[in-house]
Amino acid sequence: MPNKTLTVDQVIEQLQATAPRITELTAGLTPVQLRLPSDGEWSANDVLAHLRACADVWGSCIVSIIKGAPALRAVNPLTWIEKTDYRSLDFTRSLRTFGRQRAELLDVLRLAARGDWLLTVTVTGAGAPLKRDALFYGRWMAGHERAHLKQIAKMASALETS
């Protein structure tokens, strides 16, 4: 569940920091290391692929809400990733694309009126219909990415010392 205390500015700040932080954390890793999963964990490439799928799904929700959509159909990022080639892509190329897509999302978010973040939609397709706003999805995405940044940091540290 999302951190309910993050403000719009904090959400934007955290979303803006994700791609540069991944770049920083993985700078010393080789292409082989980026694809090397640790025990029972994903590789850095797997985490990036997952973050891209989540950003596709939740970023789309945010933009749709801000643009006034009355309803959304829920999409599970774990299902969405199966329709992509994200896991097979070169890490550096994929991260560069993620950074460009994030910049495009941030452009929309920065131009949105504060009230647009609180517009609600009905989300169907995941059980009982839910009422959600753009801030909910922004908080969810920011918190989710933060957890995976910690995962990448731990992974990179272990790989650099091995």
Model segments located where?
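Acidic/histidine-rich alpha-helical segments that form the ligand environment
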Residues: 18, 81-119
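Active-site rim elements
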Residues: 7-11, 90-95, 136-138
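Short, contiguous alpha-helical
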Residues: 33-78, 120-162
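A short small-residue
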Residues: 1-2, 78-86, 126-127
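Extracellular-facing binding/remodeling surfaces
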Residues: 29-31
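Generic structural concept
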Residues: 12, 16-19, 41, 48, ...
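Extreme N-terminal tail/first-helix region
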Residues: 1-17
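Structural signal for well-ordered, non-membrane alpha-helices
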Residues: 19-27, 56-59, 63, 99-113, ...
